[in-house]
Amino acid sequence: MRSSAVVDSGPLIALFDRDDAHHARVVQFLGSHPGLHLCSTWAVLNETSAVLSSRVGKQAEIDFLEWVERGGVRVVAQDSTALPRMRALIAKYRDLPFDFADASVAVLAELASIEQVLTLDRDFEVYRDARGRPLKNILSAKRARSR
């Protein structure tokens, strides 16, 4: 059975921006986890596309979208029923850099019962799901240093 993780925009941006400080780390991580099934949200894809387009250029954005089309990441649509939980999380973590895309990642993980996230945001270690369980950041700096 393949393991799943919800991916945030940071690793996706790093994957397609060779000048990103985390590019090599993300490429190495994904290369060493070929069975990892990535899923994400439209909010994350929007954020990733916008950053790639402005920071790297249109070709990087196009390459990213083609990768998504080929199954690099499965996009899970969230409807308006997810909004109250996203709003509640944004309010709860108002003192942290927790935005709409981050909330969409946390809510997707919660609703799909996925405990693993792939993010460069260290704050994800503090977030808790509705049952009080932490999300496990499998790309955390602690794991990278312990290798």
What are these regions (language model features)?
Residues 13, 46-49, 87:
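Amphipathic alpha-helical segments within well-ordered protein domains
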Residues 1-40, 53-65, 143-146:
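Short, well-structured N-terminal submotif of metal-dependent ribonuclease cores
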Residues 39, 76, 138:
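General small-molecule cofactor/ligand-binding pocket signal
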Residues 55-59, 94, 133-137:
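Short, hinge-like loop/turn segments at secondary-structure boundaries
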Residues 51, 88, 128-132:
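Short secondary-structure transition/capping segments
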Residues 10-11, 43, 81, 122-123:
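Alpha-helix/helix-capping structural signal
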Residues 75-117, 122:
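Active-site neighborhoods of divalent-metal-dependent phosphate/nucleic-acid chemistry enzymes
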Residues 2-4, 111-147:
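Acidic, PIN/NYN-like endoribonuclease modules and their adjacent C-terminal/linker elements
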